[in-house]
Amino acid sequence: VYKVEQIKKPLENYRDIDAFKIYVSDLGLLCAKKDLAANDILYMVEEINDFKGGMAENYVNVQLTMNGYRTYYWESERGAEIDFIIQRDGQLIPIEVKSADNTKAKSLRVYMDTYKPTYAIKLSAKNFGCEGNKKIVPLYAAFCI
């Protein structure tokens, strides 16, 4: 997943080929590589708290890719980061992924204040809903995007 330097269409033209993230296409393989037991994942034991965010992002990237989206990410000069940006129906949609109980999305607020998208998507453990122009989608429903 490449970082985009500018939020303009087409995103492909504004990617930074030297800044990227690598995701695994199979979460089972990722967990096996990290030597995580199935119960650790199912019950989200405290010892894996530092790894939950990466797993959630990886899962969402797999779902977005399977739905045909090309994914990018964005980072501000001050360190705000949007996990994914996709192009859908001619719009650039920022997507924030939250795995922790604290679902405040400060980076998403920075992005929205700067670029004024029509709407954004926040994936978390919360149920479906809306917060202003943010659509809240449960992580388990990432395939619906």
Protein language model annotation of sequence segments:
Residues 86-94:
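Active-site beta-strand-loop-beta-strand hairpin of nuclease catalytic cores
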Residues 73, 94-97:
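Short catalytic-loop micro-motif centered on adjacent basic/acidic residues
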Residues 80, 89-90, 115:
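Structured loop/turn residues at beta-strand edges in well-structured enzyme cores
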Residues 99-139:
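Catalytic cores of nucleic-acid endonucleases
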Residues 139-145:
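C-terminal helix of von Willebrand factor
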Residues 29, 91, 99-100:
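Residue-level signature for short turns and capping positions that connect secondary-structure elements
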Residues 1-82, 86:
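Accessory nucleic acid-recognition modules appended to NTPase machines
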